[in-house]
């Protein structure tokens, strides 16, 4: 009922929200929103003027090379003595401009020196990256490849021991026929020889000592002992076969006698 009466009566006015025409007739609503913006501006300007008083008017002047102001000196440092002299004589401040322009010109010279030094740096890095080949890393017995290489390894040169080296090696062999690695290194350093040369000399010297004393070779001795053991085993097997023959025959005859009974 309330909704239908409200729709039928088109002239019904809600008392809470009066029409805008009454506000416009009574000048409650301004024609443009300038009213609010002006109120804000005026209030802000008034507050700004109270906090910050207006500055005094100053006359703008044009600057040129002769009227460049001097840079502010940092705290704790006074004005240079030359500036006092120039100010006392009445010379313009533009005379100091070359000094200001000269100071920035120094870094390019340093930069050029750095640029000249940089090309040498890659060479040093390249040389440092090259692997260092020590003498012990090289193969002494392998010769360089040449055009006349026929595929066979060249003959190794025979080491010629001096009289003093042979004497020291004979002394060591008299006390120790077999060397440890530590002792071999010590002898090699003492006689200025390689470990391989010391090892080969002792091997040859042991073979000579066995030949002089007529000692049998261990390899031949082991092979002969193996053949003797095999022959002995064959003889034992044959003897056991011959011994077991009559017993088997007597057993067979005894079985036949039992069956006959």
From Swiss-Prot:
Q: Report keywords, A-Z.
A: Developmental protein, DNA-binding, Homeobox, Nucleus, Transcription, Transcription regulation
- Where does it primarily localize? nucleus
Source species, domain of life: Eukaryota
Single Gene Ontology BP annotation: embryonic skeletal system morphogenesis
Regions of compositional bias (Polar residues) in chain numbering: 114-130
Which cell locations does it reside in?
Nucleus
Q: Record's InterPro entries? A: Antp_homeobox_Deformed_sf, HD, HD_metazoa, Homeobox_antennapedia, Homeobox_Antennapedia_CS, Homeobox_CS, Homeodomain-like_sf
Provide one Gene Ontology cellular component. nucleoplasm
Disordered: annotated span: 85-130, 212-261
A Gene Ontology molecular-function term? RNA polymerase II cis-regulatory region sequence-specific DNA binding
Q: Does the keyword Mitochondrion apply?
A: no
Which family does the UniProt entry place this protein in?
A: Belongs to the Antp homeobox family. Deformed subfamily.
Task: State the name under which the record lists this protein.
Answer: Homeobox protein Hox-C4
The species is Oryzias latipes
Q: What gene is it encoded by?
A: hoxc4
């Amino acid at each position: 009922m309330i909704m239908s009466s409200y729709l039928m009566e088109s002239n019904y006015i809600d008392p809470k929200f009066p029409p805008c025409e009454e506000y416009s007739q009574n000048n409650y609503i301004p024609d443009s929103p300038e009213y609010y913006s002006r109120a804000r501006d005026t209030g802000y300007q008034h507050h700004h003027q109270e906090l910050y008083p207006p500055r005094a008017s100053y006359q703008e002047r044009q600057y040129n090379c002769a009227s460049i102001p001097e840079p502010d000196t940092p705290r704790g440092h006074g004005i240079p003595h030359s500036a006092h002299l120039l100010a006392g004589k009445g010379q313009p401040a533009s005379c100091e401009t070359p000094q200001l322009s000269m100071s920035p010109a120094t870094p390019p010279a340093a930069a050029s020196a750095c640029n000249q030094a940089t090309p040498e740096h890659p060479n040093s890095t390249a040389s440092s990256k090259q692997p260092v080949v020590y003498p012990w890393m090289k193969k002494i017995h392998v010769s360089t490849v040449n055009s006349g290489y026929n595929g066979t390894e060249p003959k190794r040169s025979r080491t010629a021991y001096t009289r003093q080296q042979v004497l020291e090696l004979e002394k060591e062999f008299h006390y120790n026929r077999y060397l440890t690695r530590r002792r071999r290194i010590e002898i090699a350093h003492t006689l200025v020889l390689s470990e391989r040369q010391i090892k080969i000399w002792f091997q040859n010297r042991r073979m000579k000592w066995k030949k002089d004393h007529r000692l049998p070779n261990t390899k031949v001795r082991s092979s002969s002992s193996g053949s003797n053991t095999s022959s002995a085993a064959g003889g034992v097997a044959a003897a056991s076969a011959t011994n077991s023959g009559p017993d088997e025959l007597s057993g067979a005859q005894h079985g036949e006698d039992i069956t006959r009974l």
